[in-house]
């Protein structure tokens, strides 16, 4: 008969099994939808995985490009801007709250704003709010709350008024 594993060896095997289990759960979650590393970490912790297990899984997921905050930021921005236009400043804040680094968020925003400018987003939101029955003063406040600059808001309101 062989020798029994030491407590240290047994602990290492248990840790490796737990990491494999966390990796499988993470891949299933990522297959459903793109997510940031921070969001994935929260989901894994919520499912009962220890922090050190979660942290050891991230390098594997990144090495195989299953977890990529830059890709998440780009996908999230496309979806977010299509459904709810917002200013660059607001989008940056929302990406950072989702755990995307400032550099990754800025890079994704630069790409987005190469395709469409902030004025276009402001005008789209203005049109959407106008259809909901917002009046001129309410429109101005709503656009400024979404962190469009006061000068851009005035310009968009003027363009929208000319077109009406």
From Swiss-Prot:
Pfam family, one: RecX_HTH2
Keywords: Cytoplasm
Compartments where found: Cytoplasm
InterPro entries: RecX_HTH_2nd (IPR053924), Regulatory_RecX (IPR003783), WH-like_DNA-bd_sf (IPR036388)
Disulfide topology: none
Main location: cytoplasm
One GO location term (cellular component): cytoplasm
GO biological process: regulation of DNA repair
Family: Belongs to the RecX family.
Job description of the protein: Modulates RecA activity.
Protein name: Regulatory protein RecX
Annotated source species: Treponema pallidum (strain Nichols)
Upper lineage: Bacteria, Pseudomonadati, Spirochaetota, Spirochaetia, Spirochaetales
Designated gene of the protein: recX
């Amino acid at each position: 008969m062989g020798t029994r594993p030491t407590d240290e060896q047994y602990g290492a095997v248990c840790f490796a099994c737990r990491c494999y289990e966390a990796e499988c759960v993470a891949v299933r979650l990522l297959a459903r939808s793109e997510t940031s590393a921070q969001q994935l970490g929260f989901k894994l912790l919520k499912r009962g995985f220890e922090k050190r297990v979660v942290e050891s899984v991230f390098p594997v997921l990144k090495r195989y490009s299953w977890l990529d905050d830059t890709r998440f930021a780009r996908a999230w921005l496309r979806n977010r801007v299509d459904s709810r236009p917002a200013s660059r400043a607001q989008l940056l804040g929302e990406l950072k709250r989702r755990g995307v680094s400032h550099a990754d968020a800025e890079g994704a925003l630069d790409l987005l704003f190469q395709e469409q400018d902030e004025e276009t987003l402001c005008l789209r939101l203005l049109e959407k709010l106008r259809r909901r029955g917002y009046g001129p003063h309410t429109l101005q406040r709503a656009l400024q709350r979404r962190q469009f600059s006061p000068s851009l808001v005035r310009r968009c309101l003027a363009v929208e008024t000319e077109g009406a």
